[in-house]
Amino acid sequence: MLLFVSRRRAPVARPVRRAADASFPNRRRPAARKHSSMHIHILGICGTFMGGLAVLAREAGHTVTGCDAGVYPPMSTQLEAQGITLIEGYGAEQIDLKPDLFVIGNVVTRGNPLMEAILDRGLPYVSGPQWLGEHVLAGKWVLAVAGTHGKTTTSSMLAWLLEDAGLNPGFLIGGVPLNFGVSARLTDSSFFVIEADEYDTAFFDKRSKFVHYRPRTAVLNNLEFDHADIFPDLAAIETQFHHLVRTVPGVGRIVTNGRSDALERVLARGCWSEVERFGVDGGWQALPAEDGVPVDERFAVYSHAERVGEVAWQVQGDHNRMNALAAIAAARHVGVPPAQAAASLAAFRNVKRRMEVRGSVDGVTVYDDFAHHPTAIETTIAGLRARIGSRNARILAVLEPRSNTMKLGVMKAQLPASLADADLVFGYGAPTGRDALGWNLGEALAPLGDKARAFDDLHLLVKAVTEAARPGDHVLVMSNGGFGGVHQKLLDALGSRT
């Protein structure tokens, strides 16, 4: 029987078995499916997802080799430390390795020499997400975290909550949680936390990656338009999210952001699982713990108007409180009491490249952050402003808009508003190559007036930031790429000032 979920209301009861929180810590666990060892050769192995998959495959006992167009540290170093042989480029001669299976990353397209050889010879191949679903996730209790923003942070929180509760989860995350020091690991636990990406699976499978994961617990963190290179509009992404909803069993649970109209539209298309909302009255909420205590330092967790825990931590921002609520609600589904989960967040150390301090020189602190979508840029600046407190402390925002969506210019009009709370803005657009912008960054930043400047020369950008920075300033570098090592360049330049 199909259940349609109305806006901001709990699902109507149905004549099926209701999802229940797992007993904690003892309960019957599903047995993981076993697979015989094989040799897999991974195309596009140095990507975040495929590199993590390679580590999991190696830990599962498979022989793993791989290739990529850019074999360089830190991913190459991490993979080689796992005993994984890496090959530079996609030469067709790699079919002579004679693996049992080729695993294809979504960076690979038709025309790739090795892929063409695989197709011409009729050799077996599969996408990375499908291989993961069939060989790692099958038989496990999968906790998948989806959403436009906060996937990496929320996945890291959730993995930590299960770890601190003694559940020893496996995980695959699109960043490096500082509590673990690795982005992926395989354990004998029945629980597996995965960052569930909506980007497409492969050139031959245009569904979102997450349809392969079959979660029992699904977190829908938020939903905005993104990935303009593959999605024409928000409705197309909503369709993919509904595909994910369709894979959650009736005894599963969906934890969703009750503030998101887009996610409410997704659920209104049909939902067959129990739904819990966070961020709204009647669901999970983060409220002041007591009068006079900043909510960024300590907040109370409420579930259905009942106070169930308290979080004291060093992670700033309303967006991170929402991430925390999602993680606590998801952890409860596998049996972690909310009070225990809330207490565990005191030891959560966040994720590399999420407001990560790269160094401090001459009173100037340089941060690294992965923000590249206008919403993420705005919330990241707001989070740093909350951390440093005083308006006398300046934020110098250094931005490289290099995501596929940004390069297309779809969101350039939103940049000024997202950067408005920074004191100075330094934008960088590569003049040539794959990261070159197809639009004028200076014109896009013009509404910010004299406080914003655009550069197409990294050396000149570093020089300008160094000249502008003064003791007490905070330089916030935002990019979803390496940004030419600008963080260290800035620290070196600041250190050489006389």
Model-derived regions, located:
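Intrinsic, low-complexity polybasic segments
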Residues: 7-17
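ATP-dependent carboxylate-amine ligase
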Residues: 24-75, 80-85, 98, 102, ...
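Short coil/loop residues immediately preceding or within conserved phosphate-binding loops
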Residues: 37, 140-142, 296
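Phosphate-binding loop of NTP-binding sites
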Residues: 56-60, 80, 94, 106, ...
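A short glycine-threonine-serine/GTX helix/turn-capping micro-motif
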Residues: 207-208, 310-318
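Acidic-glycine-rich active-site phosphate/pyrophosphate-binding loop
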Residues: 288-308
